[in-house]
């Protein structure tokens, strides 16, 4: 029987897959870590640091994808998709908080569609975080502009009516994004009313002092 040959051939293929996995998994972890730090830098307006970290993340993703190029069963295991999602989130967050206009596309970023859309959904949460920071500094108008961008992204996400197996469970991420947008809308509404009240009191005080 040729069992020895079969087992040897299988071991060779398994060893190759293990080697690819052991290269891709740390690369994905590096990318995710760099993206988390990049988002933190974005909220602090540390742009050089953010760009350096996002570039590091992209290099790590490319390294991981290169490692699994010949092993599609490992490529779709999930961790490289998670890394792409985090990278898309960081790049989209930068575009939203800076008011850059057009968002980067999946092609611009070199990421797959489903990770890109899930990254967009998570960027909505980062938009909320940035708006709350702006409100603490009284920058209501800028907060309104970011909320508008969040709304626009949500409408894209909710229009993606495809099975979860294709979208990486985008529906759940979209539901979370909707909740965050409504909370943020409420926070902004309160801030706007407070600003209007404060302005009215200031005008009244000036009128009284002017009499």
Where are these regions (language model features)?
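Long, contiguous binding/interaction regions
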Residues: 82, 122, 149-153, 157, ...
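Short secondary-structure subsegments characteristic of cysteine-rich extracellular domains
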Residues: 46-58, 138-157
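C-terminal accessory extensions/subdomains outside the catalytic/core fold
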Residues: 169-211
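Long, charged all-alpha helical bundle/coiled-coil segments in cytosolic proteins
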Residues: 53-110
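A structural signal for well-ordered alpha-helices, especially hydrophobic packing surfaces
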Residues: 35, 39-42, 61-65, 87-94, ...
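Leu/Val/Ala/Ile-rich N-terminal alpha-helices, chiefly Sec-type signal peptides and the beginnings
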Residues: 1-68
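Non-transmembrane, amphipathic alpha-helical segments
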Residues: 16-27, 39-42, 46-49, 72-82, ...
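Long amphipathic alpha-helical coiled-coil segments
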Residues: 82, 110, 142-148, 198-205
């Amino acid at each position: 029987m040729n069992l020895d040959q079969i087992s040897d051939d299988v071991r060779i293929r398994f060893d190759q897959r293990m080697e690819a996995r052991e290269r891709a998994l740390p690369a994905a972890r590096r990318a995710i870590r760099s993206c988390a730090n990049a988002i933190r830098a974005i909220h602090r307006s540390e742009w050089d640091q953010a760009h350096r970290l996002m570039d590091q993340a992209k290099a790590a993703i490319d390294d991981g994808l290169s490692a699994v190029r010949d092993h599609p069963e490992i490529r779709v295991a999930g961790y490289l998709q998670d890394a792409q999602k985090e990278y898309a989130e960081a790049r989209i967050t930068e575009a939203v908080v800076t008011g850059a206009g057009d968002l980067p596309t999946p092609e611009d970023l070199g990421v797959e569609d489903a990770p890109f859309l899930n990254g967009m959904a998570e960027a909505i949460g980062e938009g909320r975080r940035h708006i709350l920071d702006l409100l603490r500094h009284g920058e209501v108008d800028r907060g309104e502009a970011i909320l508008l961008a969040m709304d626009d992204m949500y409408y894209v996400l909710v229009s993606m009516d495809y099975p979860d197996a294709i979208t990486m469970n985008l529906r759940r991420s979209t539901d979370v994004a909707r909740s965050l947008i409504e909370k943020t809308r409420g926070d902004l509404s309160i801030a706007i009313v407070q600003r209007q009240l404060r302005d009215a009191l200031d005008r009244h005080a000036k009128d009284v002092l002017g009499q």
